[in-house]
Structure formats: structure tokens, C-alpha cells
Amino acid sequence: MKTLLLTLVVVTIVCLDLGYTRRCFNQQSSEPQTNKSCPPGENSCYNKQWRDHRGTIIERGCGCPQVKSGIKLTCCQSDDCNN
């Protein structure tokens, strides 16, 4: 009986899919490469590039933000796709 109950609990956990989250790189161009899990429901990663007095700046993270003109934005929907 205990084995049956344990089996049902395991099957329930597997079937519920305990919440997959997207993983994206999340560093600025001057920082070491890191990635993180995005908040639940956030299914996109972005790579944002622009130029200023320091040169080309690259920012990466979760989501797909609105940007001003002159900023190159690439959004994607797979893990670590924004490198």
C-alpha cells in the first residue's frame, strides 16, 4: 500500500511539471558571462546593443523590452539564446 501511494505521489509531481523557467544570459558587456533563471511566465531573452562614448555597449537579460531608436534589439525564445 505504501509503495502504491509513493508511486502516485511521484507520478503526480512529474505530471504537474513543477514550473519550467527560461534561462538567459544577463550581463553587461564589461561583466563576466553569467546566466539566470527568468521569472515565471517570462519566455524571452534579449540582447540590446548601442554605442556611446565608451564604445559598443551590450546588455543581455530576460524579456523583450521596448527600446528607443538607435538601439539594436534582438529577442529570442530558447535557453541562453541571447549570447
Curated annotation (Swiss-Prot):
Task: Give the Pfam families listed for this entry.
Answer: Toxin_cobra-type
- Asked if Membrane is a keyword of the record, the answer is no
Q: Show the stretches that span the lipid bilayer.
A: none
Q: Where is it mainly found?
A: secreted
Single GO MF annotation? toxin activity
Q: Which cysteines are joined by disulfide bonds?
A: 24-45, 38-62, 64-75, 76-81
What keywords are assigned to this protein?
A: Acetylcholine receptor inhibiting toxin, Disulfide bond, Ion channel impairing toxin, Neurotoxin, Postsynaptic neurotoxin, Secreted, Signal, Toxin
Q: Any keyword Signal? A: yes
GO CC entries: extracellular region
- Tissue spec. comment: Expressed by the venom gland.
Q: Where is the signal peptide?
A: 1-21
Protein localization: Secreted
Q: What does this protein do?
A: Binds to muscle nicotinic acetylcholine receptor (nAChR) and inhibit acetylcholine from binding to the receptor, thereby impairing neuromuscular transmission.
What's the family?
Belongs to the three-finger toxin family. Short-chain subfamily. Type I alpha-neurotoxin sub-subfamily.
Please give the name of this protein. Answer: Short neurotoxin VAN-29
Which organism encodes this protein? Laticauda laticaudata
